[in-house]
A protein has these predicted regions:
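Cytosol/nucleoplasm-facing, intrinsically disordered, low-complexity tails
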Residues: 1-118
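Soluble catalytic domains of membrane acyltransferases
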Residues: 2-6, 29, 201-204, 208-415, ...
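Membrane-anchoring hydrophobic helices of lipid-metabolizing enzymes
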Residues: 46, 73-292
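Catalytic cores of transferase enzymes with a strong primary signal for eukaryotic protein kinases
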Residues: 281, 407, 446, 450, ...
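Structured cytosolic regulatory/catalytic domains appended to multi-pass membrane proteins
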Residues: 307-311, 318-321, 438, 442, ...
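Pol beta-like nucleotidyltransferase catalytic core
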Residues: 411-414, 423-425, 433-449
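Charged, glycine-interspersed solvent-exposed loop segments at helix/strand-loop junctions
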Residues: 429-432, 459-461
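C-terminal helix/juxtamembrane-tail motif
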Residues: 454-468
Length: 468
């Protein structure tokens, strides 16, 4: 998750966004900005609705509903050519149609203006072409930087602590017992969540972490507690900071937005073999992304001990997609990713699309198109070791141009409409059912992007691209 990194001397500059004035500011300006949250009056977004919202009047809704009812009556009067049996996609569509009566009339709701940076004067200074932060910066912003630094260095910190303890012979008996436990433990896959600590997930540290960017979690639809869910998070970004903040902590208010839903963020199984670090991530409720883990999480637990009221979050694009993380773009690896769809059909879990607008803006990295040799080496490394090493850089702790810290750029995580899965389809769902549900999921991702791209990706350089 935290590979060795290299810097790009010709990195592209992406200005940070001011949604209120549409005036861009530099990274140096942003580090000394105080954040404010402005609500949109009367539910309007500065006089314009996000892309994808509908302007249909009440009369046209009534006419559409009447037409849909007449069409339904006419359809019911005809004999079903399939002898009463419907394809999976048709059956789900019948139960998932909006109250308007038609899919194409449905649109995502408006969302309020979120926290965004204000433009003020800064006192940064330059030396050797590097912009350094001024000495007089509010203490809260220093603490935010420290929180992000701790998270970015967590693997190195905990693994180094383990080796430091190993240097003491008096600790060897305890270390041997711990390593045996580490090798035999199934805590990362058994679905019991016994290590999960709501106290750790609610630490003030994580409020500071999310305030650094800042981040905000947006809800568009309810998630009933009598269902189970698989949330697909897009894009992967470099380190998936947004996914961790939203679903690995309580800092963004997921449990308040969706009371009664226990959400579990999934990560690579190899992370549960790192001493001390595996205990750290399990305290935050993280579990393995293996099939066994997903099955256990969604088949037991919850009020009825059958998985209802539980959710898992999968960063679908994986390490391969991290190599495509470029500021101002959203390139997704989704066409070939159908394993999570198959698990949704196996467990009867609804699919929920999630987009982290701004996730790709947090770092700069070498582009595969302009540096094909570096990209080939990265792909070989990914194939052999199952994780990748992005050639990236960000800002530093005390400067704005050199370092491995993410930039202070807003991240807005929008949870979309759940796609209902009517029932569990057994251990081997049909390929046609998998393809049809996957197609619906891709369509919902595109609709979610279109609905909020003008609000949360106003400075984008390219549109959504699903290329693999």
């Amino acid at each position: 998750m935290f590979p060795s990194l290299t810097s790009d001397p010709e990195r592209p500059q992406l200005p940070d966004r001011d949604f209120e004035s549409s005036i861009s500011t530099s990274n140096a300006d942003l580090d000394d900005l105080m954040l404010s949250t402005n609500g949109a009056p009367d539910g309007k977004l500065n006089g314009r609705a996000p892309s994808g919202t509908s302007n249909v009047t009440g009369e046209s809704y009534a006419a559409a509903a009447a037409a849909a009812a007449a069409e339904a009556n006419e359809r019911d009067g005809k004999e079903d050519p399939n002898n009463g049996e419907k394809r999976y996609a048709d059956a789900v569509a019948d139960t998932d149609v909006d109250n308007t009566g038609r899919h194409d009339q449905w649109s995502y709701p408006e969302l309020p203006i979120t926290a965004h940076p204000k433009s003020i004067k800064t006192g940064s200074w330059r030396a050797g072409g590097i912009r350094f932060a001024p000495l007089r910066v509010p203490m809260r912003r220093r603490l935010q930087t420290a929180a992000v630094l701790f998270h970015c260095m967590s693997i190195a910190t905990f693994v180094s602590a383990f080796w430091l303890i190993c240097a003491n012979p008096l600790a060897w008996p305890i270390i041997i017992i711990y390593l045996i436990h580490l090798a035999l433990s199934t805590a990362g896959t058994n679905g019991n969540l016994t290590y999960r600590s709501e106290w750790v997930r609610s630490l003030k540290l994580w409020k500071l972490f999310t305030g650094y960017f800042p981040m905000k979690l947006h809800k568009t639809h309810e998630l009933p507690t009598d269902r189970k869910y698989i949330l697909g998070y897009h894009p992967h970004g470099i380190i998936s900071h947004g996914a961790f903040a939203a679903f690995g902590t309580n800092a963004l208010g997921f449990r308040e937005l969706f009371p009664g839903i226990t959400n579990t963020l999934l990560t690579l199984d190899s992370n549960f073999r790192l001493p001390f670090y595996r205990d750290y991530i399990m305290l935050h409720g993280l579990q393995s992304v293996s099939k066994e883990s997903i099955w256990n999480l969604l088949s037991k637990g919850g009020p009825s001990n059958d998985g209802r009221g539980r959710a898992v979050t999968i960063v679908v694009g994986g390490a391969r997609e991290s190599l495509e993380a470029q500021p101002g773009s959203l390139r997704l690896i989704l066409k070939s990713r159908k394993g999570f769809v198959k698990m949704a059909l196996r467990t009867g879990a609804d699919l929920v699309p999630v987009i982290g607008f701004g996730e790709n803006d947090l770092y700069d990295q070498l582009s595969p198109k302009t540096h094909p040799l570096v990209h080939r080496i990265q792909m070989i490394f990914l194939k052999v070791f199952k994780f990748t090493v992005p050639a990236l850089h960000g800002r530093g702790v005390l400067n704005y141009d050199v370092g491995l810290m993410p930039y202070r750029r807003p991240v807005n995580i929008v949870i979309g409409r759940p796609i209902r899965v009517d029932k569990a389809h057994g251990p081997q769902p049909g390929q046609q059912d998998i393809d049809e549900l996957h197609e619906r999921y891709v369509q919902e991702i595109e609709k979610l992007w279109d609905a909020y791209k003008d609000q949360f990706a106003a400075d984008r350089k390219a549109e959504l691209e699903i290329f693999a």
